[in-house]
Amino acid sequence: MHAIFSSFSRKVVVNVGASSQSQLTKMVKKKPNQSRHLLPSRLSSPSSVPHFVPSAVSRSAKVHGFFASKLGNTNLKLKFGNVMESRAGFFSSELPSHGFESGGFTGFQKRGWKSWINGANGVVFGLVIANAAVFTMWRVSDRSWMLSTYSFTSGYIHTLITSGFSHIGTSQIILNMIGISYFGSRIARTLGPLYLLKLYFAGALGGSVCFLSYHALLATLKGEGVVIKDHQSTAPISQLLGADGSMFAIALLDMFIYPKVTTYFALMLRVHVMFRIINLGVEILNIPEGGPNHIASSSGQLGGVVVAAMAWARIKKGRF
């Protein structure tokens, strides 16, 4: 009896051990990741130890070289594009991204009044304010006092330049200020605010010199018996004042620098300027023939054209 019971207990123990061993084997096979996860990261498995593979190194070097070449070429293209844009921006029709036309009010809100006035637009704003102030003086003060007290005939040489700020006609000051605001802002951004100021004064001086030269030529021709029918040769000098010379110098130089037109507004202004220049040339050709002309009132425009041509010649030589 004892032998039977002992043999039966051995079979049960063997069966229980075999069944528990099979269950453990199944658990290990079903959840290998869990057992690996419980181990430390450095001792998890032999497969986690890095091995040196020459093919992988060569493959990574090729990939690295591919991306490095691509990124280098892209960076080179970007740098080359920036250089080309900076070189072509002076002569192209596209404008800088700051000023009256593009992003003006956004930058104005960020920078404020002081930086806006001190910049390129500040010179244009100052010229417009100065012309408006002198125009108001013509409206308020006595015209005879304005003409006789501060004039070139009274010995005031500076009036050769200050005459470029004097407007009497409303349409004249409106057209000139629109032209100066549009073309002047582009010149100031391209060549600098100081250059715009010098160009304005040079245009005013050139217009005054051409006006005086024309009257000197007119007196010489009349002394030789040549009759010239100038409808405005005896007109008061008040009709010959204005910033026509300065506006034409600025507008024509801008047309030389930016030959392409990008907006309809610019096209309208350029057509107006070119029409007046062509009309001026026709009137100059009529002088030797004794035909009727209005060259006296257009002499300021002629001075501006001459100043613009001289400025463009200096810019092409790199001196401006």
From Swiss-Prot:
It comes from the Eukaryota. It is found in: Plastid, Chloroplast membrane. The keyword Transit peptide applies. It is a multi-pass membrane protein. One of its GO terms (molecular function) is serine-type endopeptidase activity. Its main location: plastid. Keywords: Chloroplast, Membrane, Plastid, Transit peptide, Transmembrane, Transmembrane helix. The chain crosses the membrane at residues 116-136, 160-180, 199-219, 247-267, 295-315. GO terms for cellular component: chloroplast membrane. InterPro entries: Peptidase_S54_rhomboid_dom (IPR022764), Rhomboid-like_sf (IPR035952), Rhomboid_protease_S54 (IPR050925). Residues 1-87 form a transit peptide. PANTHER family: RHOMBOID PROTEASE, RHOMBOID-LIKE PROTEIN 16, CHLOROPLASTIC-RELATED. Belongs to the peptidase S54 family. Probable rhomboid-type serine protease that catalyzes intramembrane proteolysis. This is Rhomboid-like protein 17, chloroplastic. The gene is RBL17.
